[in-house]
Amino acid sequence: MTSAELRARFLKFFADRGHTVVASSSLVPVNDPTLLFTNAGMVQFKDVFLGREHRPYVRAASAQRCVRAGGKHNDLENVGYTARHHTFFEMLGNFSFGDYFKREAIVYAWEFLTEVLMLPPERLWITVYAEDKEAERIWLEEVGVDPGRFTRIATSDNFWSMGDTGPCGPCSEIFYDHGPSVAGGPPGTPEEDGDRYVEIWNLVFMQYERAGDGTLTPLPKPSVDTGMGLERLAAVMQRVRNNYDIDLFRNLVKAAAELAGTTDLAQSSLRVIADHIRSCAFLVTDGVLPSNEGRGYVLRRIIRRAIRHGYKLGIREPFFYKLVGPLCAEMGQAYPELVEARPRVEQVLDKEEERFAETLEQGMKILDVAIRDLGSPVISGDTAFQLYDTYGFPVDLTADVAREHGLQVDMAGFERAMEAQRERARAASHFSVDYSQEIHLDVACEFTGYRNAVEDTRIVALLRDGQAVDRLEAGEDGVVVLEKTPFYAESGGQVGDRGVIRSDSAVFEVADTRKQGSDLILHRGKLREGALLRGAVCRAEVEQSLRLATALNHSATHLLHAALRRVLGEHVTQKGSLVDPERLRFDFSHFEPVSPEQLDEIERLVNREIRRNAEVTAEVMAKDAAMRLGAMALFGEKYGDDVRVLRIGDFSTELCGGIHARRAGDIGLFKIVSESGVAAGVRRIEAVTGAAAVEAVEATERLLRRLAERMKAGRDTLEERLDQMFEKNRALERELERLKAKTAGAAGADLASRAVDIAGVKVLAARVDEADARMLRELVDQLKDRLGSAAIVLAAVEGGKVSLVAGVTRDQTGHIRAGDLVNSVATRIGGKGGGRPDLAQAGGNRPEELQGALDGVPEWVRRMLNA
C-alpha cells in the first residue's frame, strides 16, 4: 500500500464516521509566537481545545504537514543517522472537540489498524497511563486486547499537557512489533529503546485542567487529540524497518542518486537530501525564506546541510532545486499548493545554493585542515565560529562533519565567541533609549479619530518628565492624556498624528502621539502659551493636511502589498512599514532584488487601482470571518476576537487599525523611488504619492531634459546617443587594457630578473607604481608562470593607501600560504588581508614603512621553509 493510499484511506475512514476532513494548515503557525513551526496535527486546533475559537464541527480529521527542526522539537542532527528521524513528516490525526471520548477513540483506532489495514492484533502492543483505569478497561474488556501485549506506564510518557497549566490528560499509545528477529523489548521495559517495537499512534485524552498549583480539575467537555506518523505507518505496511525505504523516500533517494551519479542507494547523505528537500520545499511554499534569524535561519541551516551532503557525494554544481520536480510527483496530488509554488521554490533553493557554494569549498578545506591538525577529539569553538562567521557554516553543519569523523565541537567555546561578537556589535551601536518615559496611569482614553479630526474633550492627566502634575506652564515639554481623542497613536507603521490641544487659556502643540498598552494614548509636545490644567475642558484638533497625506500613503501601502503579491508571488508578506506624510516605506519577504520590469508592473497595478477609484471601507468583524474573506494579517501581531478589516475594492483586504483615504482615487498618483535589500530575504520599497509623486515625475523630466541638452540629442534619440557613447568608451577601455597588458609584460620580465632563490623557491617582493589591484594580480600570475616555484609580493601606492597582492605557486602552498605571506607585509604597514592559499590581497595606510616591510619578505620565506 503506497503512502498516498494510506493517507486517503485514513481520511476516508474518519469522514465516514462523521469527521470533517480539514486541510493541512501552514507550517508557520498563525498567531502563535510560542511555536517556531507546526509540529503536530493539533496545532491548528489549539484555540478550539482552549475554548477560544468555535468551529462549525465537533469532529475533525487531517493529514498535517509538520516540521521538527530548531527550537524545542529538533530532529535535525539525527536525520540521516537513524531510521525514523525526519525534519519533515506528515501526521495523521482525528480529533473530538467535546464530542466523543475514550471509547470511540480507542475503537476507531483499533478498527482502522486491524480491519482496514488488516494488521494482525498479535503484532500490536498497547500502553496506557497507569492511573487511567477507564482506558485500561476499554482496551482489555471491550476491544479484547491480549493482556500479555498491554503495559501500564506510570511516567509522564503517557500523560500529555499543553503547558505548565491548561488542558492535559492521559495517553494511550499503540506500538507495532517487528518480531523477535529485531533487537529491543516492549514499551516500559529497560530494552524499550530497541527497534523491535515502534510507536505508530498516540491517543491523547484531554480530560483535565491543570491549575498553577498543579491541581487537576475535570474538564466539562473532554476532548480527543490523536496523532500517527504517516511515514512510520507506511514502513509497517510496506514491511520495511527503515522509513527511508518506503515508496515516497525511495523515489526521492533515487532522484538524488542520479544527480550525484551514484548507484549506491544506502548512503546516508542521500537520505539526508531526500528528507531535507521535503522540509525546505514546503517551508518555502508556506512563505518562509532563507535568512539569518528565526524561521528563515532554520530553513537556511537545512538547505546548507543538504548542500554539504551533496558536496560529500561529489556534486559540485547546483542540484538541490532539481529535486522539487520529483517531490511534486510524489506529493503534489495531496498538496497542490506545492505544485503551484514549484517555480518559486526552485528559484529560492537555487539562489541559496549559489550563495553558499561560493564559500562551501573554502570552508570545507579549512575544516579538513583543522580536523587533520587536531591534537584532541574536539574541534575548537574558535574554528567553528570562524566557519560560521566567515563561510556561513551553521554550527550544526560543522558538528555534522565532526560526527562523521568521530569528533565533537566545543560548543561552549563557540557560544563564547558568538557572545563576544554580540558584545562588539552592542558596543558599536551606541543606541540609547529613555526608559524613564514609561508612564503608569490608571486612566483610559477613547479614540474617536475614525469619525472626525476635532473633538471637544477633557484633560484627565498631565505629565512632566514622566511624573504626573496638575499644571503645565508655557514653554514646558509634557504629555497630555485626554478623555477622548481624535489623534491617532503611532501603530502598524503609521506615524502618530500632530496638531494642537486648546483650552480657554492655553495652546499645547502636539508633536507626536503614542500608545502605551491597549488604551492609554499619550500626546507629547510643548505648551506654546498659557497654562494647561488637569481636568480642564479643551478642544483637540488634528493637523488635517498631515493626516490626509499620511492616510493617502497608508492606503497606497495596502495597494502596494497586494500588487507585490500579484507580481512576485503569494510568499510576499509584510515585514515592516513606515507611513508618514512625506512618503511610505514597505519591507517585505522576497529572496532576490525586484527587477526593473517587475517594479514597473507593480507601479502600473497600483496606479490602475487608483484610477479605478474604488471605495475604501472598514468593517469590524470576527477574526474567523475576516480570515475566510482572505484578509491579510501581519504575522506576529496579536489580534482579538474582533478585528477591523480594511478593503480597497476587490483588490486589497487586510486587517488594519490605521487611518485611510475615502477612495483609492484620492491617492492621485503612486511613484516608486527606490528598491533595496535590508536583510537576507527582506526587500524594501520606498514610494511617494499625490503631489510628492508628481514632483518626483517632474524631477525625472527635468533630468531627462538636461541630459538631452548635454548630449545634444532629442528625447527620441537620447538612448541611441548614450549607447554610442558607451560603445566608444568600451573601445577605449579595451585599448587601455591592451596597453596595460603590454606594459605588464615588459614589467614582468624586469621583475622576474630581481627574484632571489631561497632553497629552490624564487622569492620576489617589489613595489610597482602606477598599478591598480587588477594589474598587480595579472603581474603576479605572469610571474608565477615565469618563475616556476615561487612566492611573490607586489605593492602599489596611490593616495596614501597601499595595495598588496601575494601569490604562491601551487607546489609551495603546503609550506607557504599566500594569506600568511601578504599579512607578513600588511601588518607592518597598518593593514591586513586574506584570500586563497595561492593568491591573497591586502591593504595598508602607512606607505612610508612599505619598503622595509618588503625587504623583510625573503627572510620571512626562509623561516617558513626552514632554510
From Swiss-Prot:
GO terms for cellular component: cytosol. Zn(2+) binds at residues 554, 558, 656, 660. Gene3D superfamilies: 2.40.30.130, 3.10.310.40, 3.30.54.20, 6.10.250.550, Bira Bifunctional Protein, Domain 2, Threonyl-trna Synthetase, Chain A, domain 2. The keyword Lipoprotein does not apply. This is Alanine--tRNA ligase. It catalyses: tRNA(Ala) + L-alanine + ATP = L-alanyl-tRNA(Ala) + AMP + diphosphate. GO terms for molecular function: alanine-tRNA ligase activity; aminoacyl-tRNA deacylase activity; ATP binding; tRNA binding; zinc ion binding. One of its GO terms (biological process) is negative regulation of DNA-templated transcription. It comes from Methylococcus capsulatus (strain ATCC 33009 / NCIMB 11132 / Bath). Its cofactor is Zn(2+). Keywords: Aminoacyl-tRNA synthetase, ATP-binding, Cytoplasm, Ligase, Metal-binding, Nucleotide-binding, Protein biosynthesis, RNA-binding, tRNA-binding, Zinc. Its EC number is 6.1.1.7. Its main location: cytoplasm. It is found in: Cytoplasm. Belongs to the class-II aminoacyl-tRNA synthetase family. Binds 1 zinc ion per subunit. Catalyzes the attachment of alanine to tRNA(Ala) in a two-step reaction: alanine is first activated by ATP to form Ala-AMP and then transferred to the acceptor end of tRNA(Ala). Also edits incorrectly charged Ser-tRNA(Ala) and Gly-tRNA(Ala) via its editing domain. It comes from the Bacteria. It is an enzyme of class 6 (ligase).
